[in-house]
């Protein structure tokens, strides 16, 4: 018998041993469900429809359980009263950095020396708050008008047709790109604005090709053709967002200047800086468009809700100091005086925001539950919270949780409703579209302002209609669970025109 055969047999025996060695539940640990396939466990079910799979597991095991997914043991926690015990736990016990770095490298080919997400967040946080937030908000309003009104005027009078997702995603990402990454250098003319529209459209259409393949990228399931396409798209984006190319742009945000300085201080090459800027384009702009899509679609399908929002915006305009055509900014005090639109946004996010909140278990620990129970977690496992199922879709918390109710987050007096209950106790975490704890989204204020400004402009400056009024709201693209805002399985055709 040759050595090659001997080694082959030994390798096969070792693989068989690894595949047949099954973990057993220890006293004090959550219920364990390994599935029927060695090593893979529930990977196929989880990847096909994470929400459906986790719903079945919750019905079977309760609000905490451990499942085997592709060789990893993942403990899933679905009790919102207990989420704070996870999201504020120190990194020495529950770490979210390792998984973030893994996705950063796998999806965007970004490798940063001595990367510390916590340090990066502390440096970038001031660029998204207070006066810097106001500067971003003002610039976003200007750039939304540039792309939204400018494109429509260029296309001529009358009705224009487009998919609602392309409409929302395209205009918001393009305006967001111009806001964060800069506009054409002075002088500021109609020609420079036209060039901004052309350039930002190029960025969006290229980015969208990558975005469509993002779930496959994250799971490592690209076909040979997909890999070739992804390589070309990434190369194009790296050129569009290279620091050298961006250096000539005007009115770059303080966020961009601070981020580039941060990369330079780490000694990151220009090529890697371009990759990091593509990552940041997705992180800062990738969810606003889908969020606006769902919000507008829910309004178009609910005449009462649409009338309530329009009425609120008309009141805002009546109190404005100048006509909307002359407004160069939408002040924060105006944005903060839209409780109906705030409720609509909160309800839309409740129904469609489905991020995973993950932590790597760095050391064996006891996880305290809000009801007094305690469960042991093993070092090397992964801990997963999925707020989309609970609290956001929990029928004990929300009556008719699958139904869009535009005033769900309003009290009878018109103020914001914050009191929601589960098991007779008031919830602190009653909806978590922005994450929670140490890795809550820093750009929440900027994103909310941007979405509200977009909706304000669309509903006050345009007529917007469904081409088929009785069209059904599309199902989710199930592959996007875990990545933030869900996207539809297919787009919804609309027509729009500037109001006469």
UniProtKB/Swiss-Prot annotation:
SUPFAM superfamilies: Cytochrome P450. InterPro entries: Cyt_P450, Cyt_P450_CYP7A1-type, Cyt_P450_E_grp-IV, Cyt_P450_sf, PTGIS. Substrate binds at residues 106, 112, 287, 358-359, 382. It holds the Pfam family p450. One of its GO terms (biological process) is positive regulation of angiogenesis. It is found in: Endoplasmic reticulum membrane. It catalyses: prostaglandin H2 = prostaglandin I2; a hydroperoxyeicosatetraenoate = an oxoeicosatetraenoate + H2O; (15S)-hydroperoxy-(5Z,8Z,11Z,13E)-eicosatetraenoate = 15-oxo-(5Z,8Z,11Z,13E)-eicosatetraenoate + H2O; (15S)-hydroperoxy-(5Z,8Z,11Z,13E)-eicosatetraenoate + AH2 = (15S)-hydroxy-(5Z,8Z,11Z,13E)-eicosatetraenoate + A + H2O. Its cofactor is heme. Keywords: Endoplasmic reticulum, Fatty acid biosynthesis, Fatty acid metabolism, Heme, Iron, Isomerase, Lipid biosynthesis, Lipid metabolism, Lyase, Membrane, Metal-binding, Prostaglandin biosynthesis, Prostaglandin metabolism, Transmembrane, Transmembrane helix. Its main location: endoplasmic reticulum. Heme binds at residue 441. The chain crosses the membrane at residues 1-20. Its EC number is 5.3.99.4, 4.2.1.152. It is a single-pass membrane protein. One of its GO terms (molecular function) is heme binding. One of its GO terms (cellular component) is nucleus. Belongs to the cytochrome P450 family. Catalyzes the biosynthesis and metabolism of eicosanoids. Catalyzes the isomerization of prostaglandin H2 to prostacyclin (= prostaglandin I2), a potent mediator of vasodilation and inhibitor of platelet aggregation. Additionally, displays dehydratase activity, toward hydroperoxyeicosatetraenoates (HPETEs), especially toward (15S)-hydroperoxy-(5Z,8Z,11Z,13E)-eicosatetraenoate (15(S)-HPETE). This is Prostacyclin synthase. It comes from Bos taurus (Bovine). The gene is PTGIS.
């Amino acid at each position: 018998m040759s050595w090659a055969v001997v080694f082959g047999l030994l390798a096969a025996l070792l693989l068989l041993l690894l595949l047949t060695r099954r973990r057993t539940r220890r006293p004090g640990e959550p219920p364990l469900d390994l599935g029927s396939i060695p090593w893979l466990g529930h990977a196929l079910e989880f990847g096909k429809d994470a929400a459906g799979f986790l719903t079945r597991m919750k019905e079977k095991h309760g609000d905490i359980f451990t499942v085997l997914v592709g060789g990893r043991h993942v403990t899933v926690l679905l009790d919102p009263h207990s989420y704070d015990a996870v999201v504020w736990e120190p990194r020495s016990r529950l770490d979210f950095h390792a998984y973030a770095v893994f996705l950063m490298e796998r999806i965007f080919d970004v490798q940063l020396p001595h990367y510390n997400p916590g340090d990066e967040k502390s440096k970038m946080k001031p660029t998204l708050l207070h006066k810097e937030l106001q500067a971003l908000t003002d610039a976003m309003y200007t750039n939304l008008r540039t792309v939204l009104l400018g494109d429509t005027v260029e296309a001529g009078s009358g009705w224009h047709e487009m998919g609602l997702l392309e409409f929302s995603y395209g205009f918001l990402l393009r305006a967001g790109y111009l806001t964060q990454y800069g506009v054409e250098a002075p002088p500021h003319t109609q020609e420079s604005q036209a060039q901004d529209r052309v350039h930002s459209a190029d960025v969006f259409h290229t980015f969208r090709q990558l975005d469509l393949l993002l779930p496959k990228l994250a799971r490592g399931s690209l076909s040979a053709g997909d890999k070739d396409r992804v390589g070309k798209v990434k190369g194009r984006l790296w050129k569009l967002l290279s620091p050298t190319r961006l250096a000539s742009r005007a009115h770059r945000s303080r966020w961009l200047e601070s981020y580039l300085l941060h990369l330079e201080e780490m000694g990151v090459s220009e090529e890697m800086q371009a990759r990091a800027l593509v990552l940041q384009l997705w992180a800062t702009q990738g969810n606003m468009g889908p969020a606006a899509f769902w919000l507008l679609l829910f309004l178009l399908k609910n005449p009462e809700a649409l009338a309530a929002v329009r009425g609120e915006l008309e009141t805002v305009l009546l109190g404005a100091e100048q006509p909307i055509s002359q407004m160069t900014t939408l002040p924060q005090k105006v944005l903060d005086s839209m409780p109906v639109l705030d409720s609509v946004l909160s309800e839309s996010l409740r129904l469609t925001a489905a991020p995973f909140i993950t932590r790597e278990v760095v050391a064996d620990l006891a996880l305290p539950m809000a009801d007094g129970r305690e469960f042991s977690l093993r070092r090397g496992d992964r801990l997963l919270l999925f707020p989309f199922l609970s609290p956001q879709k929990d029928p004990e918390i929300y009556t008719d949780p699958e139904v869009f109710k535009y005033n769900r987050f309003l009290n009878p007096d018109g103020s914001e409703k914050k009191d929601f209950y589960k098991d007779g106790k008031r919830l602190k975490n009653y909806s978590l579209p922005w994450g929670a704890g140490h890795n809550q989204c820093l750009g929440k204020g900027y994103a909310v302002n941007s979405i509200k400004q977009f909706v304000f402009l669309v509903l006050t400056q345009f007529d917007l209609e469904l081409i088929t009024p009785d069209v059904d709201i599309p199902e989710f693209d199930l592959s996007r669970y875990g990545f933030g805002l869900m996207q539809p399985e297919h787009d919804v055709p609309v027509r729009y025109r500037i109001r006469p």
